[in-house]
From Swiss-Prot:
Gene: purA
Residues that bind IMP: D13, E14, G15, K16, N38, A39, G40, H41, T130, R144, Q225, T240, R304
Main function: Plays an important role in the de novo pathway of purine nucleotide biosynthesis. Catalyzes the first committed step in the biosynthesis of AMP from IMP.
Protein name according to UniProt: Adenylosuccinate synthetase
Keyword field contains Ligase: yes
Active-site residues (renumbered): D13 (proton acceptor), H41 (proton donor)
Binding site for GTP: 12-18, 40-42, 306, 332-334, 414-416
GO BP: 'de novo' AMP biosynthetic process; IMP metabolic process
Length: 432
């Protein structure tokens, strides 16, 4: 079977966790390759809801291996908490089911303090960070002064690095008008204990995955956030601190580009965004509030209400291009049931001209207004439907129009929250 990358094709929160959970049955290994616990995957299986922030969604499938790659930044407190919660639910019965990279960087208390202090200092220019220390941790990684999982396994090395890095953090926080209250010896003992808790899962992930491929195992790479939040290709600076696009899947786990055979982009049937930044199709009216309520658009990590709007075909086409998408899975199609008309942005109006591609400058995007194409809505409930032909004609027409505008096939539609409430037209693991 091929190896498949799943990435968000919008601004995150597209429902990647559900699709990964569905596709895991066809894979042997699920790999997380970037981001941290600023991402939240909400899974509903048999009516039971599980929210994961670090461990890949596939962990709910017995017999599947889940990998956290070197490109992920890990809050060890969160990782241990998720392990304990999963075990309490009867999942993760085999410790060999979870593999954690020794080279993944660690989120420390000062990263969170710096994250919050900076956001407060920015005033109206806030980016909308979750305050979980993701950005400062990636900064330390690039500056070559970060701590990695392997550092937690050597208490003497950990103590030395904590002393050095905490001093730098105090200086930065002082400049921001904040303080770092830290008992360094206690912190070292706590993080050494966390290191012992995760030591049984920690290994060289590159070697582990290479051997899995040699054994003929298939991989499912699970992205976090979305294309429009990529640090290089998103609406900078209103982005996350890592590369969220498909090209980073192999970089974030120690494999080469030939390991990827298929790239699946996940897009809602409408759109949402959390935090600041340009969002041309945003609806600040009753329709936007209706989408928010029907779609349950509140962050799995922060609980913040998401900004909502109609589907943006320009943004989706951009995601197709920068990820090299092979296909799209459309989620929350059921949320659009009951709307008299549904709209798709097919262009942007700017200074009297109509653009058919998304500008690369976010300040220019801010000045754009959407040009909409309207399609008739449908009233039929979709949750019980399981095949493409079962969908109401108007719902099928909507999906087909999105497919035409995006330039790639819509290979699946989610029609409800539960894993089983999905119509799979083409299985990426069986595609030729």
């Amino acid at each position: 079977m091929p190896n498949v990358v799943v990435v968000g094709a919008q601004w995150g929160d597209e429902g990647k966790g559900k699709i990964v959970d569905l596709l895991t049955q066809y894979a042997d290994v699920v790999v997380r390759f970037q981001g941290g616990n600023n991402a939240g995957h909400t899974l509903v299986v048999g009516g039971e809801k599980t929210v994961l922030h670090l461990i890949p969604s596939g962990i709910l499938h017995p017999g599947k291996s889940c990998v956290i790659g070197n490109g992920v930044v890990i809050d060890p407190e969160v990782l241990v908490l998720e392990i304990d919660r999963l075990k309490a639910k009867g999942a993760l019965k085999d410790d060999g089911q979870l593999v954690v990279s020794l080279d993944a960087h660690v989120i420390m208390p000062w990263h969170k303090a710096i994250d919050v202090a900076r956001e407060q200092a920015m005033g109206e220019g806030k980016i909308g960070t979750t305050g979980r220390g993701i950005g400062p941790t990636y900064e330390d990684k690039v500056a070559r002064r970060g701590l990695r999982i392997r550092d937690l396994l050597d208490e003497a090395r950990l103590a030395r690095k904590v002393k050095e890095r905490a001093a730098l953090a105090r200086e930065e926080l002082a400049r921001l008008g904040a303080k770092l209250e830290l008992d360094e010896p206690a912190l070292v003992k706590r993080y050494a204990e966390l290191g012992r808790r995760v030591s049984g899962y920690a290994t060289d992930v590159s070697i582990w995955l290479h051997r899995a491929l040699q054994q003929g195992k298939s991989l499912l790479f699970e992205g976090a956030q979305g294309t429009m939040l990529d640090v290089d290709h998103g609406t900078y600076p209103f982005v996350t601190s890592s590369n969220t696009v498909a090209g980073n899947a192999v970089v974030g786990c120690g494999l080469g580009p030939t390991a990827v055979d298929y790239v699946l982009g996940i897009s809602k049937a409408y759109s949402t965004r959390v935090g600041g930044g340009p969002y041309p199709t945003e609806l600040k009216d009753e329709t936007g509030e209706r989408l928010r309520k029907l779609g349950g658009e509140y962050g799995a990590t922060t609980g913040r209400p998401r900004r909502t709007g109609w589907l943006d075909a320009l943004a989706l086409r951009y995601a197709v291009r920068v990820n090299g998408l092979s296909g799209i899975a459309m989620t929350k199609l059921d949320v659009l049931t009951g709307f008299d008309t549904v709209k798709i942005a097919v262009g942007y109006r700017l200074d009297g001209k109509v653009l058919d591609e998304m500008p690369s400058d976010p300040e220019v995007i801010e000045r754009c207004t959407p040009v909409y194409e309207e399609l008739p809505g449908w009233t039929e409930k979709l949750e019980h439907l399981r095949t493409w032909d079962d969908l109401p004609p108007r719902a099928r027409a909507y999906v087909k129009r999105v497919e035409e505008l995006a330039g790639v096939k819509v290979v699946g539609c989610s029609v409800g929250a539960d894993r089983g409430e999905t119509i799979l037209v083409e299985n990426p693991f069986l595609a030729r």
